[in-house]
UniProtKB/Swiss-Prot annotation:
It comes from the Bacteria. SUPFAM superfamilies: Ribosomal protein S16. Pfam families: Ribosomal_S16 (PF00886). Signal peptide: none annotated. This is Small ribosomal subunit protein bS16. The keyword Transmembrane helix does not apply. InterPro entries: Ribosomal_bS16, Ribosomal_bS16_dom_sf. GO terms for cellular component: cytoplasm; small ribosomal subunit. One of its GO terms (molecular function) is structural constituent of ribosome. One of its GO terms (biological process) is translation. The lineage of its organism: Bacteria, Pseudomonadati, Pseudomonadota, Gammaproteobacteria, Pseudomonadales.
């Protein structure tokens, strides 16, 4: 099953996550089909906290990808900010 979830990046004490579309059996930071955005939980100043490619997310959801709980919250937040 395809899932949209967060893949951890960044460095120690500075987490950074990529929103990726991957098979649910793959490891968290393993191979993925596509990167559809990023999330920076420790953004400061002019740094962008959340960026999502809404068109690609809509496509992947239409073909059956399931977002993780945290990604679903982030997608809702992103849609609210875009409106």
């Amino acid at each position: 099953m395809l899932t949209i979830r967060l893949a951890l990046g960044g460095s120690k004490k500075r987490p950074f996550y990529h929103l990726t579309v991957t098979d649910s059996r793959n490891p968290r930071d393993g191979s993925h089909k596509e990167q559809v955005g990023f999330f920076n939980p420790v953004a400061r100043g002019q740094e962008i906290r959340l960026s999502v490619n809404q068109e690609r997310v809509a496509y992947w959801l239409s073909v059956g990808a399931q977002p993780s709980e945290r990604v679903a919250q982030l997608l809702k937040e992103s849609a609210k900010a875009a409106a």
